[in-house]
Amino acid sequence: MLYIINTNSTDGRYHETHHYDCEHRPSSQHQEKLGEYNFDYIAMIFAKSKYQDADGCKFCMPTEHHG
């Protein structure tokens, strides 16, 4: 599964991580590819290494959504 992160913080608080095919992903100019991972939690480890405030999308990554 390919993951992307929103380079703009959502609500000024979180950089949301999404599956590439998520209907709620940001527009292409605000996407940064994180890479391909087998599990959401592994993608979040990488996302948090880039953006400490990274959070999972409540729609495509509900187990990683905490904000």
Q: Where do the protein language model's features map onto the residues?
A:
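Short, mixed-charge low-complexity intrinsically disordered segments
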Residues: 32-67
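Short aromatic-glycine-(Arg/Gly/Cys) micro-motifs in beta-strand/loop hairpins
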Residues: 4-31, 62-67
